[in-house]
Amino acid sequence: MKGYLWGGASVVLVTVAQLVLKWGMMNIPLLSLADINVQFLTMYFVQLASVMCGLMGYALSMLCWFFALRYLPLNRAYPLLSLSYALVYLGAVLLPWFNEPATLLKTLGAGFILLGIWLINIKPIKAS
């Protein structure tokens, strides 16, 4: 059970990190390193902080993942990472600032990912 908690924490952190990174990068103009100055840093502080928080989220997710691997067999742990694909899709569709459309095919794809994770992680039926 401990391994699944660590794995779940890793999935949540990587999902939030991906969404926060996307928001930050959507709101920072494309520019070169020569364009970065104090005015730019103050003008886009929230967006840059969002990107930094996303990167820290990835690092914390990796730390949680190390603990998940310690307690779970790899063939059960690794598919848990796929949860983030479905959760990021859900976040991108539901959160208004991303404005991404939900389509039947994308939703079915996310559903199949969840079904696959469930099939891999269910307890086998013992023959009597």
Curated annotation (Swiss-Prot):
It is found in: Cell inner membrane. The keyword GTP-binding does not apply. Keywords: Cell inner membrane, Cell membrane, Lipid A biosynthesis, Lipid biosynthesis, Lipid metabolism, Lipopolysaccharide biosynthesis, Membrane, Transmembrane, Transmembrane helix, Transport. One of its GO terms (cellular component) is plasma membrane. It is a multi-pass membrane protein. InterPro entries: Flippase_ArnF, Small_drug/metabolite_transptr. Residues 32-47, 99-101 are periplasmic. One of its GO terms (biological process) is transmembrane transport. Its main location: membrane. SUPFAM superfamilies: Multidrug resistance efflux transporter EmrE (SSF103481). It comes from the Bacteria. Pathway: Bacterial outer membrane biogenesis; lipopolysaccharide biosynthesis. Heterodimer of ArnE and ArnF. Translocates 4-amino-4-deoxy-L-arabinose-phosphoundecaprenol (alpha-L-Ara4N-phosphoundecaprenol) from the cytoplasmic to the periplasmic side of the inner membrane. PANTHER family: 4-AMINO-4-DEOXY-L-ARABINOSE-PHOSPHOUNDECAPRENOL FLIPPASE SUBUNIT ARNF-RELATED, SMR FAMILY PROTON-DEPENDENT DRUG EFFLUX TRANSPORTER SUGE. Belongs to the ArnF family. This is Probable 4-amino-4-deoxy-L-arabinose-phosphoundecaprenol flippase subunit ArnF. It comes from Yersinia pestis. The lineage of its organism: Bacteria, Pseudomonadati, Pseudomonadota, Gammaproteobacteria, Enterobacterales.
